[in-house]
Structures are given as structure tokens and as C-alpha cells.
Amino acid sequence: MNISELKSKFTSISKLKKGGQKTVYKASDFNGQVVALKIIGNATDPRVLQEISILKELALNNIPKIIDSGTVTDEMINEDALFIIEQFINGISLRDWLNEGNKANISTAFKILHTLLLIEIELEKNNILHRDINPNNIILGDNGAIYLIDFGLAKKLGDSSLTQTAATYGPFTPGYAPHEQFANIKLAQDVRTDLFQIGVTIYECCTGTNPFIKLNDTPYQIMTKTMTLMPPTLILKGDAKGMFAHYINMLMAKNQSQRPDTAYDALRYLNAIKSTLKLED
């Protein structure tokens, strides 16, 4: 089957975005189901194959489900490509929401944080690290739900690594990855790596800016600030005792040992401070 034949299986199809070797479409099949169709240029890309494997293993309401996947021929260049058909999420990315000038109040921040921790608990049960939690990969659904997407950097703990041990840097998104990730310290990467990223993401939700990124910063400058800069403490209406701000600082701790040991611990700590927060219903 080639790409044109694959597209013919849908009654309507429109391109949403293209980046690198991946093109994403919104499509409707003959049963009226709306799906996301992804076509990736390299059919042997190990990270994409790993992402497919991980997503097929997971069955969580807050992660888009894979409906089908396989290999298809790109007739333009006569080479194989991968395709993924997955659940389509109506909504807006957290990145686009922030780019519209929005900032999260204490209630919205708590909801996003609480949902991400529930997802992280399930990932931890399955020995999976996402490793790329940031506003680009969080969808605020039109139905009020919050979704975590893009498992392209995800890692199954215990599996062989796709990055050479001798490599100076591991795969990461600057400004969100902690030191143990971008420095490619493989044995140190665990759930606390994801918790750091969650902390930075929530901080950015509340302030509108990533504390480690300024315009025109190089990746090296961002990494240096991630290791050395202590972000200004959050000041949020509804956090009179500063417990939420302290909690976010704990997630963003430079020293891994100062972050919660597990996602469950992180959720337990969050629930323990909930009574100090003035949350809207």
C-alpha cells in the first residue's frame, strides 16, 4: 500500500502540521470516526518504532490511543514510511494556550499538575519514562480533560538504550530536561526526571515564561541555567502560605534526591497541601 492508497481510506483529510520527517493529518474514516493520521518518512526510525510499541502497551484515558500502524510506500521517492492512526483529540496545546497570553491560576495549575501526576503514576507502573513533558506535548481537551502526547523520547526502563553511552548529550528538550537527562547519565534517569519536567511546565503555566529560557539563548546557555539558576519563587493568588510554590520548587530541585522518589509520593505531597490552597470549584 502506498500513501495515496492509505489516504483514500478516509472521506476527508487535512494537513495539521509538518515537522522534520513527520506529517500529521486530521482525517475522517467511512464510519465517521475522526482520527489523527501521522506519516513518518523513515520506516526504520527506532524511536518511532519504540513510541508505537509503548503506546500500544498503554491504555490510559489521558493518552491518545493507537488505532492502527504499519508501513506504507512513499511513491514520490519509492521508499517505505511509517503510518500511525490514533485517537484525535479536540483541543488546544498548552503551548498555544500560553502563546495566546493566558496564564494559569492556582486552580488551573492544580488541575493540570494533578492530572500529569496521575498519568505519571501509570507510566511508572509500566516502567516508562516520557522524558519530554512540556507545553507542546500537553493538550487541553475541549471536553475539559488533559492529555499527554508525543512519546518520541520515551524510554522503557530496562530496555537497551537508543543513545550511545559515550554520547555527550542524550535526547532532550532544552529548558525542560534536568541535568541527568541532557548529560546522558542513563542510570540516573527515572521518574524524578519526568517530575522535574512537570515542575518546569507548571511554573511556566503560572508565569507565562520558562525560567531557564530567554530569547536567543543557545542550548548550552539553557543547560547551564538549568543546572545553576534558582527560579524566582512563584507568587500565586490562592497560595497564601506559599505551599504550592514550595512544592513546585521541590519538583524542580537540581539535586535529584531532593525531588519526590515516586510519582505516587509526589501526588501524596500535593494532596497534603491541597487544604492550604484556595481552589475554585
Residue ranges: model-predicted function:
Residues 65-82:
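Short beta-strand micro-motifs within the conserved protein kinase catalytic domain, predominantly
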Residues 165-181:
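Conserved activation segment of eukaryotic-like protein kinases, specifically the C-terminal portion
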Residues 77-93:
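Conserved short submotifs of the Hanks-type protein kinase catalytic core
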Residues 45-57:
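AlphaC helix of the eukaryotic protein kinase fold
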Residues 112-113:
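Activation segment signature within eukaryotic-like protein kinase domains
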Residues 120, 124-140:
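Catalytic-loop of the protein kinase fold
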